[in-house]
Amino acid sequence: MSPLPFRQQAAAPRLPTHYRLQTEPHPSGEAINALLISCGEPTHPEERWSLALSRSLWQLSIVDERDQTLVGFIRATSDLALNANLWNLAACPGDDQNALLNALLYHALARLKKELPGCSISISAPAIALEGLKKQGFILDPGGIRAMGLRLR
């Protein structure tokens, strides 16, 4: 029996020059929302980001070292038993967007596999990330499984 494809790790992608991957400090809610807006993704109230980050296992950010702008982001949550979830995957549109997405995915998955090796991993991601997810072994909606969300008001 061959190992599941998402458990195999692809080669580590290189970040383009002048970008830095970091876990600390956490980006501000304002910076995360600015990134999400640039990606055409929905934003959240700035004050809710500190709560979301405090309830996350960790977050990974990519910062442009030239102007210290947040250009990539992803965060992880888990029940620490069976399930891990990756949220808010975003990378600034432009020539480096795919490289930034691939770096975030690679490092997030490597960390989850190391820290929570038995967990199933799900991800909420924009359509532009599909190719990178497939390279990491993800299968789009395997067996017809569909994720659903409910926005609470």
Language-model-detected regions and their locations in the chain:
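Conserved acetyl-CoA-binding loop-helix of GNAT-fold acetyltransferases
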Residues: 97-111
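Short amphipathic alpha-helix that is part of the acyltransferase structural core
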Residues: 2-47, 144-148
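Short, charged/polar "capping" segments at the starts of alpha-helices
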Residues: 129-133
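Conserved acetyl-CoA-binding loop of GNAT-fold acetyltransferases
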Residues: 135-144
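A conserved beta-strand-loop-helix scaffold within acyl/acetyltransferase catalytic domains
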Residues: 44-66, 70-90
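C-terminal binding/interaction regions
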Residues: 135, 148-152
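Conserved GNAT acetyl-CoA-binding A-motif
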Residues: 112-125
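A short, internal acetyl-CoA/4′-phosphopantetheine-binding micro-motif in the GNAT/acyltransferase core
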Residues: 89-99
